[in-house]
Amino acid sequence: MKNYLFEVCTNSVESCIAAQEGGANRVELCAGIPEGGTTPSYGEIAMAREVLTTTRLHVIIRPRGGDFLYSPVEVKTMLKDIEMARQLGADGVVFGCLTTNGGIDVPVMKQLMEASKGLSVTFHRAFDVCRDASEALEQIIDLGCDRILTSGQQATAELGIPLLKELRERANGRITLLAGCGVNEKNICRIAKETGIQEFHFSARESIKSGMEYKNEAVSMGGTVHISEYERNVTTVKRVKDTIESITSSL
């Protein structure tokens, strides 16, 4: 029997609780989901650690949205955030840095890896926008990362199945491939079967309505991209369970 592992991308403490109750082995805690995930606050990490008693806690270290080319000040910020995550009891951290020409920024990654000693490290989906996936794979292995979160350089992991399979074969057990982006209860079995990958990253979110009775929908807290203040996406126990059971029930 294959030993599958399930990581839920959580956007709040509430989502962490649902992920744990649904059977997730690990969560990746993120703020700023519309930007692809940014470093969560001190309080969010502390509370997530408090409620996660059986599920491992990984924290994304990403000071902003946008590209993965970081200034010296941003690198210093990331180093401080890694230390904060460690002090608050995180089991792992998630980050990735690129050069101007789309390669892995090995010198910066070495700094972050040194700061992360003793923690599990995932190289995140910066991998999916790097120039050469094969070269990047070898560099990330040499850096000592534990896993790579990737969609196979496609918009979703399902579309990235060919490269995901190739990467797993190239890695040959030297690093874990974590398939993520668009993974759900409808496609997880196909991705597992066709790639041979055994770790999966998914959000299992649903939209819930605000509890506000008074609403002024003419005013938005965001900029040009309108996101309603009166509904939000949260991980639900049901969707976590459904996604996990869709693959474990087929064993």
UniProtKB/Swiss-Prot annotation:
Family in the record: Belongs to the CutC family.
Cystine connections: none
InterPro entries: CutC-like (IPR005627), CutC-like_dom_sf (IPR036822)
Subcellular location(s) per record: Cytoplasm
Molecular function, one GO term: copper ion binding
One Pfam family cited in the UniProt record for this chain: CutC
Organism classification: Bacteria, Pseudomonadati, Bacteroidota, Bacteroidia, Bacteroidales
Cellular component terms per the entry's GO annotation: cytoplasm
HAMAP family given in the database record: CutC
Species, as recorded: Bacteroides fragilis (strain ATCC 25285 / DSM 2151 / CCUG 4856 / JCM 11019 / LMG 10263 / NCTC 9343 / Onslow / VPI 2553 / EN-2)
Gene this chain is encoded by: cutC
Annotated keywords: Cytoplasm
Name this protein carries in UniProt: PF03932 family protein CutC
